[in-house]
């Protein structure tokens, strides 16, 4: 399966260039989204979705990001469960998961 990433970041062009640079070096296709779909997300939205990657390949990609000082809190691998979710739903789920992992879950 071809490796692809979807990286959304509306505010930090340097991070976008860094993530895209890693993808290009690793021969990973960079997916684009429409402005219409991007507009369904909050202005501060940032997320990274890995498609067609093994766990080890994701780990290697994240190591490259770490070397460049790039941190993305909301990230996931595409699964059968989430592959058809809209970006809005994916972002919401990742926000909830991130809050849970940080111990900020709602009672």
Model-derived regions, located:
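Glycine-rich, often proline-containing surface loops adjacent to acidic residues and nearby aromatics
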Residues: 1-4, 41-46, 71
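Short coil/turn motifs at helix boundaries and re-entrant loops, enriched in small/polar
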Residues: 27, 36-38, 77-83
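Short, intrinsically disordered low-complexity segments
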Residues: 29-60
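Helix-rich interaction surfaces within compact, conserved domain-sized segments
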Residues: 14-15, 58-104
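N-terminal, charge-rich interaction modules
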Residues: 1-34, 100-101, 105-107
């Amino acid at each position: 399966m071809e490796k692809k990433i979807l990286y959304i970041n509306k505010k930090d062009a340097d991070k976008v260039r860094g993530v895209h640079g890693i993808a290009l070096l690793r021969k990973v296709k960079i997916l684009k989204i429409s402005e219409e779909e991007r507009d369904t997300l909050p202005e501060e939205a940032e997320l990274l979705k890995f498609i067609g990657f093994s766990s080890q390949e994701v780990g290697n990609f994240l190591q490259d990001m770490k070397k460049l000082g790039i941190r993305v809190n909301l990230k996931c691998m595409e699964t059968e469960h989430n592959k058809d979710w809209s970006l809005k739903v994916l972002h919401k789920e990742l926000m909830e998961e991130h809050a849970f992992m940080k111990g900020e879950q709602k009672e």
